[in-house]
Design a protein with these regions (language model features):
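N-terminal Rossmann-like FAD-binding beta1-loop-alpha1 element of flavoenzymes
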Residues: 4-30
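Conserved Rossmann-like nucleotide-cofactor binding loop
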Residues: 14, 37, 194
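Short glycine-enriched loops at secondary-structure junctions
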Residues: 34-37, 121, 232
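Internal, well-ordered alpha-helical segments in soluble enzyme and binding-protein domains
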Residues: 65, 145-152, 183, 210
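Conserved FAD-binding subdomain of flavin-dependent enzymes
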Residues: 21-24, 34-88, 101-103
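Short beta-strand/turn micro-motifs composed of small residues
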Residues: 10, 33, 94
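Flavin (FAD/FMN) cofactor-binding and adjacent substrate-gating region
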Residues: 78-159, 163, 170-175
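Flavin-dependent oxidoreductases
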Residues: 17, 175, 180-232
Length: 232
């Protein structure tokens, strides 16, 4: 590993996007990653959803974030020569009359119309139960995390900026900005849940959230949308 403007610890989605942007802006970068051991990005759903939570509220700055994200990922597809970004509506299924009423009220509020809409009358919901109503969330998308991570890795390896291995904290000196004797202007940790094992940040009150993935196969027809319901 050679000295550089930046050393980035972790080649997950955050570290990869940051390294890519820095390289595009002419900075020198070195990345170290432990071969995605336990990386959450490989199992993440990759859903971009501007309307979230049980109260159906807009994500912070969603009107700005989605156009930026779309442009960013489309540029990545061109630069990395891959396909991993898909514009796709979210089909929100209501589980009760109360949820349906909440949707109706929220959709009528200022700033929500561009994100919330009704499906056409001939929409085929297939095996889905839409007894209490089904609605569309727009400006949503699906990103394929494994595909984009592999494309990023090939990109970084081709440029000689990625080292596969564990970061050795005993050979890191933040006081003089060196790692294994090499000089770096900035060190950026993008180590995800492993921040709990990072001696510089482990004191922070993190509470990692653990999810579940269920892979389902069915012969029933399902619409080509991202399908979700509110939790609870």
């Amino acid at each position: 590993m050679r000295g550089a403007d930046f050393i980035i610890v972790g080649q997950g989605i955050a570290g990869s996007c940051l390294a890519f942007e820095l390289l595009e802006r002419g900075a020198s970068v070195s990345i170290i990653d432990d071969d995605w051991r336990g990386a959450a990005c490989l199992v993440a759903a990759g859903v971009i959803n501007p309307i979230t939570g049980q109260r159906l509220v807009k994500s912070w700055r969603s009107s700005v974030a989605h156009p930026y994200a779309r442009g960013f990922y489309k540029n990545l597809e061109s630069r990395l020569r891959g396909k991993f970004f898909h514009d796709r509506k979210i089909l929100q299924l209501c589980k009760s009359p109360e949820e349906s009423e909440l949707w109706r009220r929220r959709a009528g509020e200022s700033g929500y119309a561009e994100f919330m809409s009704e499906p056409p009358a001939d929409e085929n919901f297939g095996a889905l139960d839409d007894s209490f109503g089904a609605h569309f969330i727009g400006h949503s998308a699906w990103v394929e995390p494994p595909a984009i991570m592999r494309a990023f890795r090939d990109y970084f390896i081709a440029r000689g900026v990625l080292e596969v291995g564990a970061f050795d904290f005993t050979r890191f000196s933040p006081e003089d900005g060196t790692y294994r004797g090499e000089k770096f202007k900035k060190t950026i940790f993008c180590d995800g849940w492993r921040v709990l094992q990072n001696p510089y940040f482990s004191w922070l009150p993190y509470r990692p959230a653990k999810g579940e993935i269920l892979t389902m196969k069915t012969d029933e027809f399902l619409p080509e949308h991202i399908i979700q319901t509110l939790l609870g």
